[in-house]
Amino acid sequence: MAESELQLVAQRIRSFPDFPIPGVLFRDISPLLKDPASFRASIRLLASHLKSTHGGKIDYIAGLDSRGFLFGPSLAQELGLGCVLIRKRGKLPGPTVSASYALEYGKAELEIQKDALEPGQKVVVVDDLLATGGTMCAACELLGQLQAEVVECVSLVELTSLKGREKLGSVPFFSLLQYE
């Protein structure tokens, strides 16, 4: 990984204590999105990892609603791939499949269009941040319903203390930046 590019990305992540509730340290990617050089570096670094790990053996990038949409299409473009969207319930037209996941106070659902992928296609799931792993795990379940193969999940930021990586089980996971 190009250390100077990684430093450029890391410098554009800000921390806000006690947001959105007391005791939470929020990692804000807004400065990264505002700076074209940093954003470009984040995409290049993720793409470089995927190329070296999987070569040309990825068919699609799947972006998670909503901030995965910021990275998914750009990453797909960098790799010369298409991007499919995994949305929150009720946001996609046509036939869909869904998977639910737990939130702190209740549950939520993700959906993907039934015709988004063919069985056996190889997919990388991307989001901005991995916390508890609930959303990413639900995305993997959805892709499994379509008989797609999740070859890896990636994110810009990983909050290691929340152990989301463990929830993914045997699915490989990669993040550019790790914080407690």
Curated annotation (Swiss-Prot):
The modification N6-acetyllysine is found at K114. Pathway: Purine metabolism; AMP biosynthesis via salvage pathway; AMP from adenine: step 1/1. The modification Phosphotyrosine is found at Y60. Its EC number is 2.4.2.7. Keywords: Acetylation, Cytoplasm, Glycosyltransferase, Phosphoprotein, Purine salvage, Transferase. The modification N-acetylalanine is found at A2. It comes from the Eukaryota. GO terms for molecular function: adenine binding; adenine phosphoribosyltransferase activity; AMP binding. It is found in: Cytoplasm. It is an enzyme of class 2 (transferase). Homodimer. Belongs to the purine/pyrimidine phosphoribosyltransferase family. NCBIfam families: apt (TIGR01090), PRK02304.1-3 (NF002634), PRK02304.1-5 (NF002636). HAMAP family: Aden_phosphoribosyltr. This is Adenine phosphoribosyltransferase. It comes from Cricetulus griseus. The lineage of its organism: Eukaryota, Metazoa, Chordata, Craniata, Vertebrata. The gene is APRT.
